[in-house]
């Protein structure tokens, strides 16, 4: 049985023959018999210091899925130094940092300022596949810091207060310092959280539209509904703005994985014969791709597929995880 003939799009050189014409169509079409290869999008979250950056940058370089280069968005201050990245992985990264702007008129002191939402959207919507030939992956480190900065920016600018209230001086927001100075600090109010959450969801939406694999690093937080029980209703996940957004943020991503340090006791053989064995406590780096307790995780798999990486204990290099992930068929199209 032959595949159905798809309608053809119009092109700048003129309409194609043999099918309907959609002038400047804002949609694409593909034959279901030969779908495009699936791109990986994942949020990796966990407490600070568990090795998330080393994990997301230890990719199987040079493979068809991951490419030989990755765009590494060093949003966390200091992450551009790549100290948390294994030396052998650093040459494969193209480091991108948010750019500060100089503010200050003639005769005024010049200061460095940044609009975090604007800068993040510039990065999220850039054509990285064209800017970095050979790159098939974008890594954002980290999403939590971006969310915190957006919330502060929304509060400091008073974006959620109506212009009429500002003119009348009816704004009830608590603030510290001069509003015209970069040092000004305002205490966020409830509408600020709503605005910042909306901004994060929009950033996340555009980021996932990149024609690349997308990996985002976050720290962890949890949401317990008022009146809910600790066991059944509390949801742990990646931290962004507030806690009510956690389930909503996670649902948009195909993969949400949690990293943690788990303490284990191992037996150590004696150095000399006849001496008793000893026991030593060690920290193991563990990645979970399925829910454990309140901590939510998920992994995309083909229909009927089995998750062989529900719990993964890291060796000296996280590249082994990614190779097993690719070999297992997880993350591929249905």
Question: What is each residue range found by the language model?
Answer:
Residues 137-248:
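P-loop NTPase motor core
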Residues 206, 212-312:
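Phosphate-binding/switch region of NTP-binding enzymes
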Residues 297-334:
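NTP-binding/hydrolysis catalytic cores, primarily Walker-type P-loop NTPases
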Residues 32-140, 144-149:
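Conserved P-loop
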Residues 28-31, 51-53, 201-202, 243-244:
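A generic local structural motif
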Residues 58-62, 96-102, 152-155, 221-224, ...:
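Short regulatory "switch" loops immediately downstream of catalytic or recognition motifs
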Residues 2-33:
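N-terminal pre-Walker A segment at the start of P-loop NTPase domains
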Residues 112-116, 134-137, 186-191, 244, ...:
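Glycine-rich, flexible loop segments associated with nucleotide phosphate handling
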């Amino acid at each position: 049985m032959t595949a159905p003939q798809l309608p053809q799009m119009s092109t700048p050189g003129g309409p194609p023959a043999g099918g309907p014409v959609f002038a400047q169509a804002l949609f694409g079409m593909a034959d279901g018999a030969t779908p495009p290869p699936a791109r990986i999008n994942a949020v990796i979250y966990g407490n600070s210091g568990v090795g998330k950056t080393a994990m997301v940058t230890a990719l199987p370089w040079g493979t068809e899925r991951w490419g030989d280069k990755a765009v590494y968005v060093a949003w966390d201050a200091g992450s551009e130094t790549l100290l948390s990245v294994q030396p052998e992985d650093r040459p494969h990264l193209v480091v991108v940092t948010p750019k500060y702007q100089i503010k200050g008129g003639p005769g005024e002191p010049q200061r460095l300022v940044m609009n975090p939402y604007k800068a993040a959207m510039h990065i999220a919507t850039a054509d990285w596949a064209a800017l970095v030939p050979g790159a098939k992956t974008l890594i954002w480190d980290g999403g939590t810091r971006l969310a915190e900065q957006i919330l502060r920016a929304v509060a400091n600018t008073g974006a959620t207060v109506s212009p009429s209230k500002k003119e009348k001086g009816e704004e009830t927001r608590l603030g510290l310092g001069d509003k015209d100075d970069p040092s000004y600090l305002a205490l966020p109010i409830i509408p600020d959280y709503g605005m910042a959450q909306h901004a994060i969801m929009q950033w996340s939406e555009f980021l996932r539209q990149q024609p690349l694999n997308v990996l985002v690093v976050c720290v962890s937080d949890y949401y317990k509904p008022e009146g809910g029980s600790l066991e059944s209703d509390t949801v742990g996940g990646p931290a962004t703005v507030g806690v009510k957004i956690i389930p909503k943020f996670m649902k948009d991503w195909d993969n949400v994985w949690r990293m943690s340090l788990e303490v284990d006791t191992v037996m150590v053989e004696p150095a000399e014969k006849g001496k008793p064995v000893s026991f030593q406590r060690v920290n193991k780096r563990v990645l979970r791709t399925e829910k454990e307790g309140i901590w939510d995780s998920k992994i995309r798999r083909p229909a009927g597929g089995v998750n062989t990486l529900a719990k993964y204990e890291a060796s000296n290099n996280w590249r082994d995880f990614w190779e097993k992930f690719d070999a297992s068929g997880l993350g591929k199209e249905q």
